Amino acid sequence: MMAIISSQNSPPERSRPPSVLSNQPTPEEQHSLAEDSLRPHSLQDYIGQQELKEVLHIAIQAAKARQEPLDHLLLYGPPGLGKTTIALILAAEMGVNCKVTSAPALERPRDIVGLLVNLQAGDILFIDEIHRLSRMTEELLYPAMEDFYLDLTVGKQQTARPRRLKLNRFTLVGATTRAGALTSPLRDRFGLVQRLRFYHPEELQQIVQRGAALLQTPITPEAALEIGRRSRGTPRIALRLLKRVRDYAAVKHDGRITLDVARAALELLHVDPAGLDGSDRRLLRVMIESYQGGPVGIETLAAATGEDVQTIEEVYEPYLLQMGYLQRTPRGRVATPRAWQHLGYTAPENQLPGLSSPYDTLS
């Protein structure tokens, strides 16, 4: 595939600031040294995702034994589960550099070309939201991933000439929340495809305790578990809540995070014991009060709540589905009896059977 390198600017996208329970990183978290300090830097320190860790450990040891770069890796799952962290850990374990970018930042061919030609042998290129790559950028990646070269067209019109650039062997780590949105040619070029799952409260408890130790904040095991239970199965949210509870403990108490302190701080943040915030409860309440629990079409639900469809599908729905508060049907979304009960309503008999939480057996 030949790509013409040209210059074309587009206005940046505008986005709403995430809430305390958003699984998207805030701008401060994206550039925070404190956030980096809380990341694990080795597979041994990485908590949870045991099957994934075993697969990656084998891949790392095999690549080192053959003195080859790692195979290309696709990570998929809800936001905030540690995809970027895994890419950085792989680079540390392999002793190479890791370049981090995202698909929206690679709109023009020269953007991806500039990254690829500057990679050293064995380096890792991490592309977040890889399902959003433009068609031209994606097609540039095909020969780069398979044969480590780029076919370019340099110049314009009569002065245009083809040029093939050889690349150093590298590892592409792609991350996506929508694996089904990837084209088959791109997905098939990844040698490893791994799914990240939501974390159990006990795993999040360990993450919170580790984070508190790094932040030099005393915390009881019960308080760490309480924060973990309200973190929507997501480490990013658990660490964000830890920081807010730490602030509360420092201002309102003696700096120690006990169970009572954690509960008081989380109530102040409107995070309920199930990990739902005001936006989640509003979404479910609209379905119950305005549409008798559903089914409700996603477009209708977005209009009624003032949220866009993508936010509902990628931010709210994964956790509500996982915890059994929401059900997708061919006719639309349905609030389950579990959601009715959580909000203090009595579900009608014709509603879907109640769904249990995957964490019920763990509490």
UniProtKB/Swiss-Prot annotation:
One GO cellular component term: Holliday junction resolvase complex
Stretches for region Small ATPAse domain (RuvB-S): 200-270
Gene Ontology BP annotations: DNA recombination; DNA repair
Gene3D superfamilies: 1.10.8.60, P-loop containing nucleotide triphosphate hydrolases (3.40.50.300), Winged helix-like DNA-binding domain superfamily/Winged helix DNA-binding domain (1.10.10.10)
Keywords: ATP-binding, Cytoplasm, DNA damage, DNA recombination, DNA repair, DNA-binding, Hydrolase, Nucleotide-binding
Binding site for DNA: 328, 333
EC number in record: 3.6.4.-
Localization terms from the record: Cytoplasm
Compositional bias annotation for Polar residues: 1-12
Residues binding ATP: 38-39, 80, 83-85, 146-148, 189, 199, 236
Keyword Cytoplasm: yes
Reaction(s) the record says it catalyses: ATP + H2O = ADP + phosphate + H(+)
InterPro entries per record: AAA+_ATPase, AAA_lid_4, DNA_helicase_Holl-junc_RuvB, P-loop_NTPase, RuvB-like_N, RuvB_C, WH-like_DNA-bd_sf, WH_DNA-bd_sf
Region described as Disordered: 1-37
Disulfide bonds: none
Similarity comment: Belongs to the RuvB family.
Domain notes from UniProt: Has 3 domains, the large (RuvB-L) and small ATPase (RuvB-S) domains and the C-terminal head (RuvB-H) domain. The head domain binds DNA, while the ATPase domains jointly bind ATP, ADP or are empty depending on the state of the subunit in the translocation cycle. During a single DNA translocation step the structure of each domain remains the same, but their relative positions change.
Protein's name according to its UniProt entry: Holliday junction branch migration complex subunit RuvB
Highest classification ranks of the organism: Bacteria, Bacillati, Cyanobacteriota, Cyanophyceae, Acaryochloridales
Name of the encoding gene: ruvB
